[in-house]
Amino acid sequence: MESENAEAENVVTGNLEAKSKEGKNMQFVTLSSAWSLQALSSLLNPEEEDGFDFEQGQCSFTIGAMGPGNIGPPKAKESKAIPEPRSDESENIWNPEEVPEGAEHDDIWDVREIPDYEIVFQQTVGTEDVYLGLTRKDPSTACCQELVVKIKLPNTNPSEIQIDIQEMLLDLRTPRKKLLVNFPQPVERNSARASYIWEAETLEVRMTVQRDLDFNIS
């Protein structure tokens, strides 16, 4: 019995020694691979050779992290540029240029009614235009001299009408009515003429259109 136990112990001891040798051999192979990668990296980057720690503890710590990506110079970290705010940016929720002209005159709390209105272009046509064709006039709005705004104001006293005319805007107020009109073309504000037609209960405002074309005979 004692001889059998001794033989069993010898077998177990032999197996442990064999496994220990295999583990040492694997560790040696792994360490050799790590040393080879570090040596190759040192050849490619001689100026960084002093920065490497070849001690066994340091080597064993970096074994798992070594790979083909460690060969060559270290990758520089990409720095993301933070865009600086433009000097023209402000805390406004919209650009002042995007606000339509006349919006500052509008009041959402004003409950006055908006009257009906229409915009009409008019032009003066003479015999030289109809029969002789001596000018370059045509029926388009570009050839019209006047812009007429007709506003329905029933039961309104003309003395109660307040009107303000800008180059691209008409602002009309009465005790019961309110109207803001944006013109399709700029007008000469000093040329405005207003008249109230009692039969039609309509206010007509005539203004001269600012024209780029000149239809006078040269």
Curated annotation (Swiss-Prot):
UniProt biased composition (Basic and acidic residues): 75-89
Pfam family, one: PIH1_CS
GO molecular function: dynein intermediate chain binding; protein-folding chaperone binding
Tissue spec: Specifically expressed in testis. Detected in pachytene spermatocytes from 5 weeks of age and in pachytene and diplotene spermatocytes of adult mice. Not detected in spermatids or mature sperm.
Keywords recorded for this protein, A-Z: Cytoplasm, Golgi apparatus
Entry GO terms, CC: cytoplasm; trans-Golgi network
Protein name per UniProt: Dynein axonemal assembly factor 6
Organism: Mus musculus (Mouse)
